[in-house]
Swiss-Prot record:
Binding site for GTP: 58-61, 86-87, 130-135, 174
Source organism of the structure: Bacillus subtilis (strain 168)
Name of this protein: Ribosome biogenesis GTPase A
Any one GO BP annotation for this protein: ribosome biogenesis
PANTHER family assigned to the protein according to its UniProt record, in alphabetical order: MITOCHONDRIAL RIBOSOME-ASSOCIATED GTPASE 1
Miscellaneous comment text of the record: Estimated to be present at 1000 copies per cell.
Gene that this sequence comes from: rbgA
């Protein structure tokens, strides 16, 4: 599955982010806790250089908690502070400012020693589309400032947002790479809804989701669709799910498009519980 999706505003965002780094104290890199590595754009490393950073594992309520802990340890071992958060209900957000102060303490101590008046922390929020940047900003600012939605790419311009007296945030459009080198990265992004459904082969995504569930969460798969056993043949598995869910056409034939929609919707709406689609060792 080849996915290419790189709107012009994303290329512009990269240039503007690079320019704004001089104004920034710290970067909040927002990733999807279900796919922390796949939801990181490799070129972000090149853009950020050695800027202080906090990795925010968003949508942690949707991810397998044990796997999320593995990821936090993985990033900490790389010298990157990481926090589990939920930008929708605010879980973990109260840790962001204290963690930022701790990381930036030496910098602000030097500023005070030079007689520079203390100011708010200036942070840049960066991440791929649909990872929850706008929702996070709105939650922190307690206002509906940034546009939000479940369509990837909804934030199209950069803006500064004041969060109390201690923090100023710069939101950026989601930055996605031009072409996925690894097909699995594209599939993981697609199954979690980070890529527009209109540009992907949804049946490929459903097959990926089923195979993943079969390998890592087989009991949940059987329970959800009332299966005694999971057929080895993927077509038979589709047939079984389509039949169980009433995805039928005239003559009793399986409607594969409808079955595909059911599978993907069930995954995205947590009908299988909390799922993590990659681990640090994968």
């Amino acid at each position: 599955m080849t996915i290419q999706w790189f709107p012009g505003h994303m290329a512009k965002a990269r240039r503007e982010v690079t320019e704004k780094l001089k104004l920034i104290d710290i970067v909040y890199e927002l990733v999807d806790a279900r796919i922390p590595m796949s939801s990181r754009n490799p070129m972000i490393e090149d853009i950020l250089k050695n800027k202080p950073r906090i990795m925010l594992l968003n949508k942690a309520d949707k991810a397998d908690a044990a796997v999320t802990q593995q990821w936090k340890e993985h990033f900490e071992n790389q010298g990157i502070r990481s926090l589990s958060i939920n930008s929708v209900n605010g879980q973990g957000l109260n840790q962001i400012v204290p963690a930022s102060k701790e990381i930036l303490q030496e910098k602000f101590d030097r500023m005070r020693a030079k007689g520079v008046k203390p100011r708010a922390i200036r942070a840049l929020i960066i991440g791929i589309p649909n990872v929850g940047k706008s929702t996070l900003i709105n939650r922190l600012a307690k206002k509906n400032i940034a546009k939000t939605g479940d369509r990837p790419g909804i934030t199209t311009s950069q803006q500064w947002v004041k969060v109390g007296k201690e923090l100023e945030l710069l939101d950026t459009p989601g930055i996605l790479w031009p072409k996925f080198e690894d097909e699995l990265v594209g599939l993981r992004l697609a199954v979690t809804g980070a890529i527009k459904d209109s540009i992907i082969n949804l049946q490929d995504v459903a097959v990926f989701g089923l195979r993943f569930l079969e390998e890592h969460y087989p009991e949940r798969l059987k329970e959800r669709y009332g299966l005694d056993e999971i057929p080895e043949d993927i077509a038979e598995l589709f047939d079984a799910i389509g039949e169980k869910r009433g995805c039928l056409m005239s003559g009793g034939l399986i409607n594969y498009d409808k079955t595909t929609e059911v599978i993907i919707r069930d995954i995205r709406t947590e009908k299988f519980g909390r799922l993590s689609f990659e681990q640090p060792t994968m």
